[in-house]
């Protein structure tokens, strides 16, 4: 989720930890990528980030690829469908790098999906709480 990418980047920046993390987001499907060009952040998601003074300008969708598995220590999907897609694209998870974001809050539930609810603030709150717990687990 680009929302998670930029919320987490904002958190680490505020703690002066930007140099300690590489944070990016990738799609698990091609729905937001046309002719090899990714769409920008969905306008309502961009709007909710802007309301929280978080800038996501310039971000475009890219799809996760198998080579990403070796590049990152953790891969953090937003929901169970993302977990399945990531496992398929990455050909499994032998090093146990895939963890749903909400698992860091002690919950097994998915991040509220604004595609179905239209509630981008609830989605933001889920992601914020998940990112906060994730960061606390790492520092």
Task: Enumerate the language-model features and the residues they cover.
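Phosphate-binding/catalytic loops
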Residues: 68, 74, 80-139
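A structural signal for well-ordered alpha-helical scaffolds and beta->alpha junctions
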Residues: 38-42, 79, 131
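Conserved active-site segments centered on acidic
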Residues: 1-71, 136-139
């Amino acid at each position: 989720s680009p929302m998670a990418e930029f919320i987490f980047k904002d958190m680490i920046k505020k703690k002066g930890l930007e140099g300690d993390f590489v944070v990016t987001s990738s799609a698990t499907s091609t729905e937001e990528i046309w002719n090899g060009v990714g769409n920008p952040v969905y306008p309502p998601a961009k709007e909710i980030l802007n309301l929280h003074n978080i800038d996501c300008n310039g971000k475009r969708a890219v799809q996760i690829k198998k080579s990403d598995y070796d590049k990152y220590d953790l891969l953090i999907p937003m929901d169970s469908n993302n977990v399945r897609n990531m496992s398929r694209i990455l050909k499994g998870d032998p090093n146990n790098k895939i963890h749903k974001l909400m698992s860091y809050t002690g919950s097994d539930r998915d991040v509220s999906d604004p595609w179905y609810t239209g509630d981008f603030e609830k989605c933001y709150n889920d992601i914020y709480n998940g990112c906060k717990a994730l960061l606390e687990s790492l520092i």
